[in-house]
C-alpha cells in the first residue's frame, strides 16, 4: 500500500515528471499548441449512489476541460460487454458486469488538450489502496471493485469508448467565448 508520504510523492512525480510536464505548464509560445482530445469519463453506480457526480464534474471543469456530452443511463449489458471485452476471460468479469448494471451510470465526454492522460492522473490508481490523496479515487473510492469512476486509458481507447456510449448527435461542439479560467490556450 505504501505510506501517505510515498503516495503523495508518487503523485507529484507523475504530475511533475518530464513525460507529464504539460500537466503543469503551458508549451512555449513558439511551440505548437496542444492537440484537442476527447475522452470518456463514467461515474460508476457507486459514485452515482454516493452523489459524487457534481464533484467529478467540478474537478474536470476546474482543470479547464470542456464537457461536450453527458447522459445518465442504466447501462445495457450489450454496451458493458463490448466496453469490457478485454476482461471477458478474467474471473471477476461476471461480478464487474453485475456491478456496472446494478444502478445508473453517468457517462460524459470531456474535451481538452492532453485530456486522456490528465484525466487518468486525476482519477488515480484503480486500486483505492494505491490511489494517491487528491485523486478522485484516492479521495472517494472505498474498494477496488467499487472505485467510483472510469476514464479512457488511451486516445484510441477513448475514441472506441465514445463511439460505443454516444451517438455523434449527442456530442456538442460549442465555443466557450473565451470565458474560462483555464491555464490552457483557447
From Swiss-Prot:
SUPFAM superfamilies: Nucleoside diphosphate kinase, NDK. Its main location: mitochondrion. ATP binds at residues 44, 92, 120, 126, 137, 147. It is an enzyme of class 2 (transferase). It is a peripheral membrane protein. GO terms for cellular component: membrane; mitochondrial intermembrane space; mitochondrial matrix; mitochondrion. It is found in: Mitochondrion intermembrane space; Mitochondrion matrix. Belongs to the NDK family. Major role in the synthesis of nucleoside triphosphates other than ATP. The ATP gamma phosphate is transferred to the NDP beta phosphate via a ping-pong mechanism, using a phosphorylated active-site intermediate. Through the catalyzed exchange of gamma-phosphate between di- and triphosphonucleosides participates in regulation of intracellular nucleotide homeostasis. Binds to anionic phospholipids, predominantly to cardiolipin; the binding inhibits its phosphotransfer activity. This is Nucleoside diphosphate kinase, mitochondrial. It comes from Mus musculus. The gene is Nme4.
Amino acid at each position: 500500500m505504501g505510506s501517505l508520504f510515498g503516495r503523495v510523492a508518487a503523485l507529484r512525480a507523475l504530475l511533475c515528471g518530464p513525460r507529464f510536464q504539460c500537466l503543469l505548464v503551458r508549451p512555449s509560445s513558439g511551440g505548437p499548441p496542444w492537440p484537442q482530445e476527447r475522452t470518456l469519463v463514467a461515474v460508476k453506480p457507486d459514485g452515482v449512489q454516493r452523489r459524487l457526480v457534481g464533484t467529478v464534474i467540478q474537478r474536470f471543469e476546474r482543470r479547464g476541460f470542456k464537457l461536450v456530452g453527458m447522459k445518465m443511463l442504466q447501462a445495457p449489458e450489450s454496451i458493458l460487454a463490448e466496453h469490457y471485452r478485454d476482461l471477458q476471460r478474467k474471473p471477476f468479469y461476471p461480478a464487474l458486469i453485475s456491478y456496472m448494471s446494478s444502478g445508473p451510470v453517468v457517462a460524459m465526454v470531456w474535451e481538452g488538450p492532453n485530456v486522456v492522460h490528465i484525466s487518468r492522473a486525476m482519477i488515480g490508481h484503480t486500486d483505492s489502496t494505491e490511489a494517491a490523496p487528491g485523486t478522485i479515487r484516492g479521495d472517494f473510492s472505498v474498494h477496488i471493485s467499487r472505485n467510483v469512476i472510469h476514464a479512457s486509458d488511451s486516445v484510441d481507447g477513448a475514441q472506441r469508448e465514445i463511439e460505443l456510449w454516444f451517438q455523434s448527435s449527442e456530442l456538442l461542439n460549442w465555443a466557450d467565448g473565451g470565458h474560462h479560467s483555464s491555464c490552457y490556450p483557447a
